[in-house]
């Protein structure tokens, strides 16, 4: 019995693990499989090889290969980009809250932040441009508006009550954006604001002069609810920044609501109506001159405005510059 067990045929388990295990040839010279389960091995191997061959031939396009690599790396890239935005997010948040404080609670600060981040991503594409394609600039990046914005900042610096500082990007970042977009930029000193002539004569201000709020003048000229556009577009206009005493009087007379720390500017009604009649606004359908709710000011406030206008006149600036001793 022991001899019979030793000389028996091969175990089925060992036979099935040996692919291509073939017994003795038959009478016709054809190989005979000793284990019928080996029939399943060869078709599976052929099918697997065919699938692998199709996969290798499907991605011979270089663009597809690079896109596959990008898809693999994209999650890591997104994490690093997000970390960069998180680093600068405090600046965007402060700026958005500042805009909401100046314009009103109807401003969606989160939407402003999202739009700013998307603009950053769009501008970052310039780093990988081929030098032939031109990415269109945003409307607020046009040269004329940039100059107006600089003039507005200059005017704010000269105001007796400085406006609350706004968060901005470093100067070298802006200069890089301008160079990348191919913009021609001139320094501020080349385009001084002329504060002279009859409109800058302090004698025109008296107790019968009518004034309007800057926010209402902005709407009257069809610039919508975006605060400050009139100052950017027309930096030559005389505007007076009301101090806390002035704002208290204006609120008591119901000319404006109590604004807390917000800036309130007063413009001369005659200047606004002259602008509305100029070629820039003649025939404009967005004009809403009924928004101009004019009023007169007390003598003590008019006197402050005269002194302020006198200090801003171009002639006095030149005299002050000439009187400065040269070292």
UniProtKB/Swiss-Prot annotation:
InterPro entries associated with the record: DNTTIP1_dimer, TdIF1, TdIF1_C
Region (Disordered): 1-34, 146-172
Spans annotated as Important for DNA and nucleosome binding: 195-314
Region (Important for dimerization): 55-146
Protein location: Nucleus
Motif (Nuclear localization signal): 162-168
Keywords (A to Z) from UniProt: DNA-binding, Nucleus, Transcription, Transcription regulation
Recorded GO MF terms: DNA binding; nucleosome binding; protein homodimerization activity
Basic and acidic residues bias locations: 146-161
Residues in the DNA-binding region annotation: 157-171, 214-235
GO cellular component, one term: nucleus
Gly residues bias locations: 1-11
Keyword Nucleus carried by entry: yes
Tissue: Expressed in thymus, bone marrow and spleen.
Statement: the UniProt record of this protein carries the keyword DNA-binding: yes
Domain-level remarks: The N-terminal domain mediates dimerization.
Function of the protein: Increases DNTT terminal deoxynucleotidyltransferase activity (in vitro). Also acts as a transcriptional regulator, binding to the consensus sequence 5'-GNTGCATG-3' following an AT-tract. Associates with RAB20 promoter and positively regulates its transcription. Binds DNA and nucleosomes; may recruit HDAC1 complexes to nucleosomes or naked DNA.
Entries under PANTHER family matching the protein: DEOXYNUCLEOTIDYLTRANSFERASE TERMINAL-INTERACTING PROTEIN 1
Subunit composition and interactions: Monomer and homodimer. A minor proportion may form homotrimers. Interacts with ZNF541. Interacts with the terminal deoxynucleotidyltransferase DNTT. Interacts with TRERF1. Identified in a histone deacetylase complex that contains DNTTIP1, HDAC1 and MIDEAS; this complex assembles into a tetramer that contains four copies of each protein chain. Component of a histone deacetylase complex containing DNTTIP1, ZNF541, HDAC1 and HDAC2. Identified in a complex with KCTD19, HDAC1, HDAC2 and ZNF541.
Identification of the protein by name: Deoxynucleotidyltransferase terminal-interacting protein 1
Organism per entry: Rattus norvegicus (Rat)
């Amino acid at each position: 019995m022991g001899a019979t067990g030793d000389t028996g045929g091969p175990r089925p388990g060992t036979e099935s693990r040996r692919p291509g295990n073939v017994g003795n040839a038959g009478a016709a010279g054809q190989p005979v499989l000793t284990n019928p389960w080996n029939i399943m091995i060869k078709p599976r191997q052929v099918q697997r090889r065919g699938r692998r061959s199709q996969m290798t031939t499907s991605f011979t396009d270089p663009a597809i290969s690079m896109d596959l690599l990008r898809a693999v790396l994209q999650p890591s890239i997104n994490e690093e980009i997000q970390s960069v935005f998180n680093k600068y997010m405090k600046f965007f948040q402060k700026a958005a809250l500042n805009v909401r404080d100046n314009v009103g609670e109807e401003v969606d600060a989160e939407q402003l932040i999202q739009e700013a981040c998307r603009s950053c991503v769009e501008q970052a594409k310039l780093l990988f441009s081929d030098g032939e394609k031109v990415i269109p600039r945003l409307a607020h990046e046009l040269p004329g508006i940039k100059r107006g914005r600089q003039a507005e900042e200059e005017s704010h610096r000269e105001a007796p009550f400085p406006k609350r500082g706004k968060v901005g990007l470093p100067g070298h970042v802006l200069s890089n954006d301008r160079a990348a977009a191919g913009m021609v930029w001139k320094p501020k000193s080349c385009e001084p604001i002329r504060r002279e002539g009859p409109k800058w004569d302090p004698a025109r201000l008296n107790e019968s002069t009518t004034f309007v709020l800057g926010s209402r003048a902005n709407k009257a000229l069809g610039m919508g609810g975006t605060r400050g556009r009139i100052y950017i577009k027309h930096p030559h206009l005389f505007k007076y920044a009301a101090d806390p005493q002035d704002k208290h009087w204006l609120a008591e007379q119901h000319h404006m609501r109590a604004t807390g720390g917000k800036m309130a500017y007063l413009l001369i009604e005659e200047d606004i109506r002259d602008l509305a009649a100029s070629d820039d606004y003649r025939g404009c359908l967005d004009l809403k001159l009924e928004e101009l709710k004019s009023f007169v000011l007390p003598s003590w406030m008019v006197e402050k405005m005269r002194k302020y206008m006198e200090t801003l006149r171009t002639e006095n600036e030149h005299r002050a510059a000439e009187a400065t001793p040269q070292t």
